[in-house]
Amino acid sequence: METLNLFVRSIFIDNMVFAFFFGMCSYIAVSKSVKTAMGLGAAVIFVMAMTVPLNYLLNEYVLAPNALVEGVDLSFLTFIVFIAVIASFVQLVEMVVEKFSPSLYNQLGIFLPLIAVNCAIMGGSLFMQQKVVAGEIDSLFQSIVYGLGSGLGWAIAIVMMAAIRERLQYSHIPAGLKGPGIAFIITGLMGIAFMIFSGIQL
């Protein structure tokens, strides 16, 4: 039940976009089309589902104080190691997408490799580390669940935004609010709507 609660919280309550406003650059830029948003969302789910558990293992058995050698604390390498792991998986995703879906690769453009520095993905690993200290994550399986849930939450957010923005193309929006302006307002409203999930315990 704790694992299910962790999964639900990572999607709805601790949503990377609506709760922390992480990954906003690609969220705003790529959310103009549902198809493109789904492609980037799938890439983010994969990268987070892979990197969070891998970073969990590195944190537990290499970086944590006394993990590798008694009396040695390598936690100062956390950011470098986490970013290296994330960048490696993003490179793998980029090669796969370019090989099997050139059209999606061209639509995503620079934002696909930019997943490597997407603060939502880095945030997932850092929040995982925080939850390990707090005792909310205490196994590899729970880290996989958290990574998958966090990625799914971000993907749901960008697909919802893309669906709304596709409809907005046929609406009369004041000139000053067109583009990112209205997108930020809608994101704020959706964030408020997602607050209804706060306090849910399974």
Language model features with spans:
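Juxtamembrane transmembrane-helix termini in multi-pass membrane transport proteins
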Residues: 5-46
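Structural signature of hydrophobic alpha-helical transmembrane segments
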Residues: 5-19, 72-86, 144-157
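Cytoplasmic-side transmembrane-helix entry/capping segments in multi-pass membrane proteins
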Residues: 36-46, 77-82, 104-115, 176-182
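Ordered, amphipathic secondary-structure segments that act as subunit-interaction surfaces
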Residues: 60-108
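Hydrophobic core segments of alpha-helical transmembrane domains in multi-pass membrane transport
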Residues: 22-26, 44-50, 83-92, 117-124, ...
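Generic transmembrane alpha-helix signature in multi-pass membrane proteins
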Residues: 21-29, 94-100, 111-114, 119-135
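Interfacial loop-to-transmembrane junctions
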Residues: 166-185
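C-terminal ends of transmembrane helices
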Residues: 22-36, 90-104, 161-172
